[in-house]
A protein has these predicted regions:
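Hydrophobic alpha-helical segments
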Residues: 1-201
């Protein structure tokens, strides 16, 4: 898989560049670089799935598990991270500019779409009624609920709040918790997919 290898090297280079310059970066530059890195990782995941044929998998369970790994969960994790960072800055400044409001609304809309797709994938996996999928389904629903609640906080405390009063650290912490719950589902999905693929060997 030479193309995936090249993309992996690009990701490693970008990450090492961030590590070397982290202490000297401004907050906006650091945020932009981390966002670019996440985008590269997402592209690497999808490209690797395409090269191995997993995105065309004929078995429904592994197909929807792969969708969780390559599409829905990365989109939710990245979207929540953007909302967490931007929202934290807005609450700290006490001002919501039109540009940032538009960015937050777009991220929220994309997250809503990813949540719908996530629940559809979990629903299809649940239809198979496999005992080994139980934890994934439970944690997946919890993560979806956490992110949905976070989007609600964004709407109530930032987008439609005239006088913002929420503690920025509290908003950031809730976002971190939502990301952690989605990351846990990601790891469970990866483990489940590995087990499924091993069963075919």
């Amino acid at each position: 898989m030479p193309e995936s290898y090249e993309k992996w090297n690009s990701v490693k280079t970008a990450w090492n560049d961030i590590l070397r310059s982290y202490e000297t970066l401004t907050a906006p530059d650091s945020f932009a670089r981390h966002s670019d890195l996440v985008q590269q990782v997402e592209e690497l995941i999808i490209h690797g799935a395409d090269e191995t044929g997993l995105t065309l998998d004929s078995e429904i369970q592994s197909y929807y598990t792969m969708k969780l790994i390559t599409q829905e969960l990365p989109a939710l994790i990245e979207g929540t991270a953007v909302i967490r960072g931007r929202g934290n800055g807005v609450l700290a400044a006490g001002t919501l500019t039109d540009d940032i409001k538009l960015e937050l609304l777009l991220e929220a809309a994309q997250s809503d779409k990813a949540l719908i797709n996530l629940m559809q994938s979990l629903s299809r996996i649940a239809e198979l009624n496999r005992s080994e999928d139980g934890e994934l389904l439970q944690k997946g629903e919890q993560a979806a609920g956490n992110i949905r609640n976070y989007l609600g906080v964004l709407d109530q405390e930032i987008i439609h709040k005239q006088a913002m009063s929420m503690n920025p650290d509290a908003f950031f912490a809730q976002g971190t918790d939502a990301i952690a719950s989605a990351s846990e589902v990601f790891q469970l999905a990866v483990t489940l997919l590995e087990q499924t693929l091993q069963e075919r060997i």
